[in-house]
Amino acid sequence: MMKHTLLILMLLICGMSASAQLTLKSDKGDFEARLIGRALFDGGVFFSDKTSLGNAVEVYDVRVGTVVRFLERWTGKIEMGFAKSKVSMKDIYIEYNDGKNLFRIGHCYEPFSLEYRIGTSDMKFNGAAVTGIAFGDRRRLGISYTYNCDVLNVSGGVFSDKDIDNTEKGDEGYAFSGRVLFRPYSKEKNVIHVGVSSRFGVQGEAEENKLTYSAGAPSNLISEKFLKAEVTDAINEWKFGAEVVMVLDRWYFQSEYLMAHVNRKASVENYTGDGWYAQVGYALLNGRYGYNKTSGMA
């Protein structure tokens, strides 16, 4: 057990990213292809009275992909990740967006929760909140629909409950996800939104009827999972989330509550876990935080 450990997050642990893009456009402007890529760095100096944590600097993830826009309202994206010497599939989807209606199919995030869905290119801190990592969303194969207007954003989707990297045989589970946002204040670039989301998933043989909730320290240098619960004999899972986001001038505030409940076979007790977080930021050097109304994320 690590006691009295101090992580100097603001000064001694630094998360950095470097990104690059190459864009090709047609003369008529009806086709555009962008090659995207970024590298994510992490470094830290740790002080501990008992547990020995090594000071280090590392490249913890590299992303490479392409985004293609065609026929005015269609977009396709393929992105791969190379973290810890392993190749993983990230966003692989095609979508149609007419401004108010968005249809998406492929390997992408379900419309549930907020923090863990924020892309690495848009992260505001060194890593995602522990609550978001443990109970938040994951990418799955499926289809979703989003309706968006000035004051309202409603999303829903149907997905496979199997991780795309899971090679186990057997019937896959399935999941239904939904998210509703209300923006009581929206003026120019300032916005306040409140929202709720829910997810219902049924585990299949391919998932071995097991669910794992885990999270570690807010640094990629520490691989240990300090919070971990393996829930076996799972029948189905309910998740619920509530969120608040405020982007006002240079200020940014985000808070979220997430809860997971697992119904298990009669021989064992059901599992319920929850958590919450709050984070605030202030943009320096004449900058400000942005907000995407379609995704409902700052």
Predicted regions and their residues:
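Single-residue recognition of alpha-helix boundary sites
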Residues: 14-15, 117, 161, 260
